[in-house]
């Protein structure tokens, strides 16, 4: 019931001082109140939901899309007894965002993550969602955008090339001392945070040593968006490298006004044994 959801999420909420928009979203989600949840969206809103299970995605645009998204979701969330939100990070600094890890295996949502990007008016203009739900119907093939030019695309092209070449120095060109990378492993429930260039270097040095066998590397979804009025530039990436133990992964990159990566939220599924623990 909605009461179960409210109580399940309440404990997680206690630890945070979330912004007004997130507070409303949280409460509206808990009561499954679609009308209330829509207060946080606008006609510029876009919600992208990717299912790791079958590599398909659904895109919901504008107010009508957001309404359809949550109507469909709340119907699917029939049994909330397993609902948990182990990580909620509300980022007040630009770009304003929320990084969420949640799950509800009792309703088929084995693993889920959302990144919310807010505009200056406190509306959710982008929401990238990855779920692992084996029972969900197949949706559309995921989008890989064509390069359009612009600072975000330039940084992304460099990042992609540097990643493929495992060139740490080249990859650092896209980051600044203010950059933050959060990496959450849904298998081990561990979150590691990297802040600043030294930490970013450590992050990719470790990752590249982990990615010892690239034969299984794939990136089925790459969505690059330049900044627009009131909305930061971003990239939504879904990738995997099961040959190196990375069975599922997704990154949402949020860019600063200069086209550098300000925030990067990474969620992986990597068995602990593979991580050398």
What is the meaning of each model-derived region?
Residues 2-9, 13, 67-151, 157, ...:
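A beta-strand edge to alpha-helix "cap/lid" segment located at domain peripheries
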Residues 11, 28, 58-62, 90, ...:
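Tandem-repeat/low-complexity and Cys-motif detector
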Residues 13-33, 148-167, 174:
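Short, aromatic-enriched amphipathic alpha-helices that serve as compact interaction elements
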Residues 22-25, 56, 66, 70, ...:
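N-terminal leader/targeting signatures
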Residues 33-50, 167-184:
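Short, well-ordered alpha-helical segments enriched in acidic and aromatic residues
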Residues 40, 73-76, 162, 174, ...:
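Structured segments of extracytoplasmic/periplasmic soluble domains
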Residues 45-60, 72, 180-195:
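A short gly/proline-enriched turn/hairpin at secondary-structure junctions
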């Amino acid at each position: 019931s909605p009461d179960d959801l409210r109580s399940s999420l309440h404990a997680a909420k206690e630890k945070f001082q979330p912004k007004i928009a997130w507070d409303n979203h949280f409460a509206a989600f808990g009561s499954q109140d679609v009308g209330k949840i829509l207060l946080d969206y606008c006609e510029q809103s876009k919600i992208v939901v990717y299912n790791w299970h079958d590599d398909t995605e659904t895109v919901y645009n504008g107010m009508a899309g957001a309404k359809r998204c949550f109507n469909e979701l709340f119907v699917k969330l029939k049994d909330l007894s397993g609902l948990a939100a182990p990580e909620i990070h509300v980022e007040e600094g630009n770009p304003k965002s929320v990084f969420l890890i949640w799950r509800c295996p009792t309703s088929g949502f084995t693993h889920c993550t959302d990144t919310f990007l807010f505009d200056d008016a406190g509306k959710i203009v982008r929401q990238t969602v990855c779920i692992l739900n084996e029972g969900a119907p197949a949706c559309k093939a995921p989008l890989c955008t064509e390069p359009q030019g612009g600072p975000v695309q330039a940084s992304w092209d460099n990042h992609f090339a540097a990643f493929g070449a495992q060139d740490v120095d080249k990859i650092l060109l896209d980051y600044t001392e203010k950059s933050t990378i959060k990496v959450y492993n849904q298998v081990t429930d561990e979150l590691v945070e990297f802040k600043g260039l030294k930490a970013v270097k450590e992050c990719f040095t470790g990752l590249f040593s982990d990615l010892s066998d690239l034969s299984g590397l794939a990136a089925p979804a790459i969505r690059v968006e330049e900044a627009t009025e009131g909305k930061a530039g971003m990239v939504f990436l879904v990738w995997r490298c099961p040959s190196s133990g990375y069975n599922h992964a997704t990154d949402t990159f949020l860019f600063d006004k200069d086209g550098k990566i300000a925030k990067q939220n990474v969620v992986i599924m990597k068995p602990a044994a593979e991580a050398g623990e």
